[in-house]
C-alpha cells in the first residue's frame, strides 16, 4: 500500500506584509488536492469568519437620517455611511453570544473628526483610526454613539432595523435621539487567493504545493482567519465522516465548543463570562473593569461605590462571581 508523504505547513515570510496580510504553503499534496483544499478554504474564509461591526448609530437630537445637523458640514446620511465603516479588533473573549458594546464621541472637539476620536466603553481597539467621520465647526455640535455586536457575513439595513427594535430596551445611552440602523459587514477577510503548483512534474508521482494568501481588514490576524476557516470545514467534514450516526441531528454542527466557547473560558477571564445583565456589565466597563481578575478582589463596599451599581446589581455580580469560581475550580 502506498504511504502518504508527510505534509508540511508553513508561513511564507518572504511574502508576508504584516500580521494581517501574509501567505502560507502546504506541501506536498496529492495531485488535485491543492485546488480542492484551496477552493474550500477560500470560500469559507470569505463568507464564514465571525467578527464585530456597527449595527446601529445614535446621533444626539436626530430622529431620522434626513434630519439637518447644525454646524456640521456633512449630512446625516454621509455621517452614517462613514460610521458604519469604523472597524474594531475582534476579540471573541470580549463578545459573548449576542452581546452589545458601545463606543461614543460626545462632542469634545471641533474641526475634523476621525475614528481615533471615538472612545470605546469596552476597551475595543479601533483598527482604522484615520477614517474620516465629519467636519464640525462648533464644540458639542456632533455627539454620537455606536452600537456594536458580533456576527458573520453581511447584514443589511432592514434586518438590523428589526434587530434594533428587539434590543432597544437593552441599549443604555448618554444622549437623546433615535437609534438608526445601518448595514453591517462582519466579514474581516478582504482578499483570499490560492494557487496549486506541481512540485515534481518530472517524477512518475506528481505532487502539488498549495500557496494560500490572505488579507484581512485589521480586525483579525490573517493566520487566525485561516485557522478558523479550517476548523469550520473540519466541523462539517467530521459530521459527514460519522457514518454510524446517519439521520441524526448534530447540535454542534459548526464546532462552536471548539472554536468559540473553549477559548473564552480557557484563555480569557473577561467579565462577559459571568453572564451578567446589560446594566451591570455597562457599569463595570465604565468603571474600567473588564476582567474577572480585576473584580474578584473587590469587596461589597467596593462594588457599592461603583457608579450606577445598585444593590440588586451588586448582589447579582457577587453571586455570579462566586458561581464562576465554583465552576472553574481546578482549571487553569
UniProtKB/Swiss-Prot annotation:
Belongs to the RNA polymerase alpha chain family. It is an enzyme of class 2 (transferase). HAMAP family: RNApol_bact_RpoA. It comes from Mesomycoplasma hyopneumoniae (strain J / ATCC 25934 / NCTC 10110). This is DNA-directed RNA polymerase subunit alpha. The N-terminal domain is essential for RNAP assembly and basal transcription, whereas the C-terminal domain is involved in interaction with transcriptional regulators and with upstream promoter elements. DNA-dependent RNA polymerase catalyzes the transcription of DNA into RNA using the four ribonucleoside triphosphates as substrates. Residues 259-332 are annotated as: Alpha C-terminal domain (alpha-CTD). Its EC number is 2.7.7.6. Keywords: DNA-directed RNA polymerase, Nucleotidyltransferase, Transcription, Transferase. Signal peptide: none annotated. One of its GO terms (cellular component) is DNA-directed RNA polymerase complex. InterPro entries: DNA-dir_RNA_pol_insert, DNA-dir_RNA_pol_RpoA/D/Rpb3, DNA-dir_RpoA, RBP11-like, RNAP_asu_C, RNApol_insert_sf. Transmembrane segments: none annotated. GO terms for biological process: DNA-templated transcription. The keyword Membrane does not apply. Residues 1-244 are annotated as: Alpha N-terminal domain (alpha-NTD). GO terms for molecular function: DNA binding; DNA-directed RNA polymerase activity; protein dimerization activity.
Amino acid at each position: 500500500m502506498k504511504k502518504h508523504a508527510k505534509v508540511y505547513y508553513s508561513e511564507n515570510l518572504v511574502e508576508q506584509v504584516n500580521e494581517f496580510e501574509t501567505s502560507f504553503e502546504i506541501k506536498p499534496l496529492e495531485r488535485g488536492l491543492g485546488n480542492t483544499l484551496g477552493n474550500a478554504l477560500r470560500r469559507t474564509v470569505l463568507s464564514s469568519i465571525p467578527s464585530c461591526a456597527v449595527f446601529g448609530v445614535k446621533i444626539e437630537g436626530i430622529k431620522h437620517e434626513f434630519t439637518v445637523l447644525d454646524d456640521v458640514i456633512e449630512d446625516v446620511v454621509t455621517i452614517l455611511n462613514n460610521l458604519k465603516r469604523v472597524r474594531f479588533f475582534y476579540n471573541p473573549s470580549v463578545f459573548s453570544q449576542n452581546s452589545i458594546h458601545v463606543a461614543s464621541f460626545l462632542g469634545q472637539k471641533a474641526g475634523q473628526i476621525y475614528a481615533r476620536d471615538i472612545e470605546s466603553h469596552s476597551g475595543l481597539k479601533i483598527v482604522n483610526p484615520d477614517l474620516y467621520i465629519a467636519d464640525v465647526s462648533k464644540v458639542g455640535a456632533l455627539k454620537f454613539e455606536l452600537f456594536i455586536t458580533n456576527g458573520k457575513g453581511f447584514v443589511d439595513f432592514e434586518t438590523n432595523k428589526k434587530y434594533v427594535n428587539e434590543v432597544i430596551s437593552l441599549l443604555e445611552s448618554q444622549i437623546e435621539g433615535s437609534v438608526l440602523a445601518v448595514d453591517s459587514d462582519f466579514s474581516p477577510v478582504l482578499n483570499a487567493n490560492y494557487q496549486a503548483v506541481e512540485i515534481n512534474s518530472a517524477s512518475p508521482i506528481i505532487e502539488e504545493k498549495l500557496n494560500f494568501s490572505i488579507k484581512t481588514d485589521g480586525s483579525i490576524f490573517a493566520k487566525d482567519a485561516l485557522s478558523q476557516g479550517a476548523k469550520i470545514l473540519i466541523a462539517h467534514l467530521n459530521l459527514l465522516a460519522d457514518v454510524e450516526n446517519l439521520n441524526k441531528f448534530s447540535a454542534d454542527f459548526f464546532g462552536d465548543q471548539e472554536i468559540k466557547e473553549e477559548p473564552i473560558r480557557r484563555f480569557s477571564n473577561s467579565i462577559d463570562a459571568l453572564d451578567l445583565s446589560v446594566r451591570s456589565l455597562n457599569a463595570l466597563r465604565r468603571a474600567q473593569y473588564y476582567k474577572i481578575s480585576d473584580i474578584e478582589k473587590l469587596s461589597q463596599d467596593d462594588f457599592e461605590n461603583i457608579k450606577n451599581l445598585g444593590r440588586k446589581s451588586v448582589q447579582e455580580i457577587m453571586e455570579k462571581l462566586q458561581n464562576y469560581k465554583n465552576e472553574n475550580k481546578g482549571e487553569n
